Regions:
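C-terminal cap/loop subdomain of S1 sulfatases and analogous C-terminal strand-loop tails that border
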Residues: 6, 16-87, 92, 105-106, ...
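Active-site-proximal N-terminal segment of extracellular/periplasmic enzymes that hydrolyze or transfer
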Residues: 92-102
């Protein structure tokens, strides 16, 4: 971003498209609608070493969620099964650590960020055979 970001800088933070609107409103100096989800990335644009305080949420289909922070990816499927990957030691996600004793605290920590409410998939998507409710 001209005038904000140093040329050639980058950040390894996982971000979400929901963060774009609050970022643009902050950079433009206009109020953001509080009903809109997302967090401004302006601080990260100014200083790429800034770390996000919360993991990024990714949802695919109905009740299938993944959470990603600097080191970990936690996945929870609609059927209740789980996956956990340590990107520091396993960047290609070959070893699922869910169910192992040592990283259990990471699952507990990341689970706090799962959505409490899941909206029904769009009816049009269900008609095409996608996003079927279990």
């Amino acid at each position: 971003v001209p005038g904000v970001t140093e040329a050639g800088s980058n950040s390894n933070n996982a971000v979400n498209l929901l963060d774009i609107y609050p970022t643009l409103t902050e950079l433009a100096g206009i109020p953001s609608n509080p009903a809109v989800e997302g967090n401004s990335l302006a601080a990260m644009l100014r200083d790429p070493s800034v770390r996000k305080s919360e993991p990024t949420l990714i949802t695919h289909g109905f009740q299938n969620h993944a959470l990603r922070d600097q080191r970990w990816r936690y996945i929870r499927y609609a059927d209740g099964s789980e996956e956990l990957y340590d990107h520091k030691n396993d960047p290609n996600e070959f070893t699922n650590l869910a169910g192992k004793k040592k990283p259990a605290e990471q699952i507990t920590r990341l689970k706090r960020f799962l959505p409490e409410v899941n909206a029904d998939p769009l009816r049009a998507s269900r008609k095409r055979g996608k996003n079927k409710k279990p």
